[in-house]
């Protein structure tokens, strides 16, 4: 499992406020390779291409969390309307296939379905998601295993592990 990246802004009234994007979500806002953000804390000051000073000031003026959420949503939607950069369709399709298979799908079968060679596929996937296809599949598989453990009443952990794709 990996740690998540944090996008952080500091003002007098806000100590930390975070936004979590779906895979390929942040790549719609920036051309930066997302693997550079994995396991790191990123300040809004380092993302001047997306977040300007007016955003930080307006966010700091809000007293309630719901108002801050509204400001973030409005700002990101307005930015997206002006600067939309669609994620690579091959990568988006591969992410959907991994999610649908709950991480059990092999990287080879993903490459065959998206019609890319291994090196190019892995490079694009890592650029748009921050992870290699194998790393992302492992994360999805682990999340599925946790969900199975939470919802399954069976005392047999081996069966649960096999159902989650660990064999």
Language model features: what each stretch is:
Residues 125-131:
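A secondary-structure capping/hinge motif
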Residues 137-147:
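Short, basic, alpha-helical segments at the C-terminal edge of helix-turn-helix-like DNA-binding modules
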Residues 1-102, 106-108, 113-118, 132, ...:
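Alpha-helical bundle regulatory/interaction domains
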């Amino acid at each position: 499992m990996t740690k998540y990246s944090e996008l952080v802004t500091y003002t007098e009234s806000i100590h930390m406020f975070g936004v979590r994007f779906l895979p390929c979500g942040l790549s719609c806002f920036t051309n930066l390779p997302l693997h550079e953000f994995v396991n790191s804390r990123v300040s809004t000051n380092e993302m001047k291409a997306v977040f300007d000073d007016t955003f930080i000031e307006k966010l700091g003026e809000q007293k309630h969390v719901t108002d801050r959420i509204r400001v973030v949503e409005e700002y990101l939607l307005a930015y997206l309307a002006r600067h939309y950069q669609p994620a690579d369709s091959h990568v988006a399709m591969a992410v959907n296939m991994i999610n649908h298979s709950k991480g059990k799908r092999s990287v080879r079968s993903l490459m065959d379905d998206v019609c890319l060679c291994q090196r190019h596929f892995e490079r694009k996937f890592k650029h748009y998601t921050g992870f290699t296809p194998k790393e992302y599949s492992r994360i999805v598989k682990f999340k599925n295993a946790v969900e199975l453990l939470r919802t399954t009443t069976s005392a047999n952990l081996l069966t649960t592990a096999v159902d989650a794709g660990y064999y």
